């Protein structure tokens, strides 16, 4: 039968000792020293079945401000040696234990280094199932022979340890009660070895955490994009930059994640008509998952899964963003120009004819006489200009004078003077105007009979040849189109009107038209029209009107 535990073994600390807590920096220093000693001495143990379901805990999930100073290794080793010696002296291995002080198999396998780490951080669980520093101090006082003042019904709560005790020992068993550890026969060499010269460090391989389940893509999940945009609006980007990086994953998991996740793109600006056109013209980019929307790139940059590689992505994206934009714009413009400037399809080629038919066609072409190509404008019914034309001669003489002689010298012999006759060309032109206007505004009843004598013509009647004459009203209308003053036109009328009856014959009308042209060319009007001018109008070319007997 197991002996009940004597009350002298449980030492209750006074209130002053319970209230005095260990400073957080000292406890953190003791924790780091214990961890260092544990990593040097304890080999890796197989994971217990009770801890198989517990997820791996990262060391960086605790307080983000651990102390930077490490304790001296001598003090930690001394504490561990003292603890092992006291436990050996006070707790013999053959002492029977009570039922409530029985320790499970996992607690028996704990080494002195693990127990030292638990004592340093105050992680030994009390009788109530909670770890308190009172139990640790009670154990120390019992071993040192201190007498407790009085028992307390319940321990006074002290300040919580700085670091989670689960971080110290992943194999710690959560049992409702723990009795003081029973040192075995294998503890003495371990303690002696720990106090002796240090062994070469044996690093415990970290357990490989299971691969983090891949979250749904932010481009395809709407809630993720909404939460990311909300965090981006609240300014969580600066908070994430201040936090320490997440624990590094193993190489295998990092390789799988890098293969599965495509590289993220930088945040794009607001979509415009030009961007929509580029996306439509480049189907390769439109089908990519990053091109589904403008927000996924922002969400992927600020999601927790990408915090570790966020800075490198920013630097690479900032460098590649201008080049990608330039390349996209150039390709889009080139494709647009090619689509616009693509030439129409060539016309279908003619089928090649047989050789015999082509030879016959060539012979037929040779037999035909080529049509004379027109050298210039097509000829009309008008006759060509004669060599005696006044304008043609004047132009030729003027050109020759400019080339051969000095332009400021005058040749009196070739000077154009007043002509005493009307050319045939001018006469024909004036006679055409007369023929178109003769007999206008003359009533046939006003024309006298040819049998009447000129002395018996009543007033208001016209001579018998009045139908071949032009009335003064018609003459004034035609001559006024020359834009000469009225007094000049009156002078010309007086020079050519010989009948004084308000009518002009053919010769009078032609001479009057000729005088108007001379006035327009800058010549002065003569006092009397010369006979040569009248003769050039009345003479028919090729026929002499003179009587035959005058020549003899």
UniProtKB/Swiss-Prot annotation:
Region listing for Disordered, in residue ranges: 1-25, 41-419
Cross-referenced InterPro entries: EF-hand-dom_pair, EH_dom
Example GO BP: lipid metabolic process
Biased composition (Basic residues): 349-367, 395-409
Domain EH: 451-540
PROSITE patterns: EH
Bias (Basic and acidic residues): 94-103, 230-243, 410-419
Protein name per its UniProtKB record: Increased rDNA silencing protein 4
Lineage: Eukaryota, Fungi, Dikarya, Ascomycota, Pezizomycotina
Gene: irs4
């Amino acid at each position: 039968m197991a002996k009940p535990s004597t009350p002298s073994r449980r030492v209750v600390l006074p209130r002053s000792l319970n209230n005095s807590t260990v400073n957080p920096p000292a406890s953190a220093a003791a924790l780091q020293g214990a961890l260092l000693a544990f990593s040097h001495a304890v080999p890796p143990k197989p994971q217990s079945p009770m801890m198989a379901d517990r997820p791996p805990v990262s060391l960086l999930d605790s307080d983000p401000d651990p102390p930077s100073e490490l304790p001296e290794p001598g003090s930690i080793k001394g504490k561990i040696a003292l603890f092992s010696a006291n436990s050996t002296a006070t707790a013999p291995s053959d002492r029977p234990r009570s039922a409530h002080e029985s320790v499970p198999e996992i607690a028996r396998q704990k080494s002195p280094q693990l127990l030292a780490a638990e004592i340093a951080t105050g992680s030994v669980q009390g009788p109530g199932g909670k770890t308190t520093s009172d139990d640790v101090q009670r154990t120390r006082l019992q071993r040192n022979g201190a007498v407790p003042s009085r028992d307390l019904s319940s321990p006074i709560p002290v300040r919580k340890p700085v670091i989670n005790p689960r971080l110290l020992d992943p194999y710690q068993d959560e049992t409702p009660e723990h009795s003081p550890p029973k040192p075995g026969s294998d503890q003495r060499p371990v303690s002696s070895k720990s106090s002796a010269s240090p062994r070469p460090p044996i690093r415990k391989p970290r357990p490989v955490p299971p691969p983090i389940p891949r979250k749904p893509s932010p481009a395809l999940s709407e809630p993720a994009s909404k939460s990311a945009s909300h965090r981006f609006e609240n300014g969580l980007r600066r908070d994430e930059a201040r936090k320490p990086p997440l624990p590094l994953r193993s190489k295998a998991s990092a390789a799988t994640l890098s293969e599965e996740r495509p590289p993220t793109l930088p945040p794009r600006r607001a979509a415009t008509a030009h961007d929509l056109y580029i996306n439509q013209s480049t189907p390769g980019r439109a089908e990519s998952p990053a091109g589904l929307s403008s927000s996924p790139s922002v969400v992927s940059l600020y999601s927790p899964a990408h915090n570790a590689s966020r800075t490198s992505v920013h630097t690479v994206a900032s460098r590649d963003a201008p080049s990608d934009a330039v390349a996209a714009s150039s390709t889009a413009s080139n494709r647009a120009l090619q689509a616009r400037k693509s030439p129409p399809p060539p016309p279908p080629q003619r089928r090649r004819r047989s050789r015999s038919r082509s030879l016959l066609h060539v012979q037929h072409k040779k037999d035909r006489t080529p049509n004379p190509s027109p050298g210039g404008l097509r000829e009309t019914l008008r006759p060509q200009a004669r060599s005696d034309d006044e304008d043609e001669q004047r132009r030729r003489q003027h050109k020759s004078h400019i080339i051969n002689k000095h332009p400021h010298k005058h040749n009196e012999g070739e000077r154009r003077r007043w002509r005493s006759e009307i050319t045939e060309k001018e006469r024909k032109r004036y006679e055409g105007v007369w023929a178109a206007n003769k007999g206008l505004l003359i009533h046939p009843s006003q024309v006298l009979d040819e049998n009447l004598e000129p002395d018996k013509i009543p007033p208001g009647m016209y001579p018998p040849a009045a139908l071949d004459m032009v009335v003064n009203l018609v003459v004034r209308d035609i001559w006024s189109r020359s834009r000469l003053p009225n007094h000049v036109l009156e002078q010309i009328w007086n020079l050519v009107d010989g009948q004084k009856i308000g009518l002009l014959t053919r010769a009078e009308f032609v001479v009057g038209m000729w005088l108007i042209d001379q006035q327009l060319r800058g010549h002065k009007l003569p006092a009397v029209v010369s006979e040569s001018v009248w003769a050039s109008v009345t003479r028919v070319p090729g026929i002499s009107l003179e009587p035959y007997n005058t020549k003899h």
